[in-house]
């Protein structure tokens, strides 16, 4: 919560906050996160993405009753999204904002590969990326995109302090300037070297396929 509070104190506005997983409703402090986001005048909209696999605990229902919040259910079918109808009934009963839809446009853009692109091609790929400004807060650090956050978390990339801003441990007096430099200061990320790109040209893939075992990952670590 310290990281989110520090971030909100250091920005002018946040048009959209997204709570993602895994499954965000498994996070035991989600009600505290929502309380912080909802009370901030800087935050315009909040989206919570759920896969409909679990029931929502009764103690967080009240925290969902805010006009800023929309809950988005991705329907992966009755076997996986087995609590979808329970959620829909609950959201209708409590008059909560929600949408429900099937998986949309899953592309081959999440695999970790050593793409061996030169700096010019990496810059063009980053410029064309549809998530190059979808900043991701993970474990107290703010990354430029979800891919950068995840390859670092998986230890496929040794992330220098240029790859993220340490929101939790930075001095508040310095954080706003750090964020400005981070947002506008780079032609591409180190994580781009492990990415296939995300510019809507990648092939569509079947959604929600699960691995039965871990697979080896390429690495840029020395």
Please state what every model-predicted region is.
Residues 1-127:
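Conserved glycine-rich "GG(E/T)P / GGGxP" loop and the immediately following alpha-helix
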Residues 113-222:
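Accessory C-terminal segments flanking Radical SAM cores
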């Amino acid at each position: 919560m310290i990281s989110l509070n520090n971030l909100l104190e250091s920005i002018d506005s946040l048009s959209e906050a997204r709570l993602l997983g895994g499954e965000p409703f498994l996070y035991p402090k989600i009600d505290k996160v929502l309380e912080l986001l909802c009370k901030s005048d800087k935050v315009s909209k909040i989206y919570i993405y759920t896969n409909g696999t679990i029931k929502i605990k009764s103690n967080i229902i009240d925290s969902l009753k805010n006009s800023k919040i929309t809950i988005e259910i991705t329907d992966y079918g009755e076997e996986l999204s087995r609590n979808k109808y329970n959620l829909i009934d609950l959201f209708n009963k409590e008059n909560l904002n929600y949408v429900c839809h099937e998986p949309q446009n899953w592309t081959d853009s999440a695999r970790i590969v050593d793409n061996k692109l030169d700096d010019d091609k990496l810059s063009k790929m980053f410029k064309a990326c549809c998530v190059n400004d979808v900043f991701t807060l993970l474990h107290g650090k703010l990354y430029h995109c979800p891919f950068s956050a995840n390859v670092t978390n998986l230890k496929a990339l040794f992330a220098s302090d240029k790859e993220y801003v340490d929101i939790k441990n930075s001095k508040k007096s310095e954080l706003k300037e750090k964020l400005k430099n981070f947002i506008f200061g780079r032609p591409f990320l180190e994580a781009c070297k492990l990415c296939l790109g995300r510019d809507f040209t990648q092939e569509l893939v079947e959604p929600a396929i699960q691995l039965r075992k871990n697979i080896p990952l390429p690495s840029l670590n020395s």
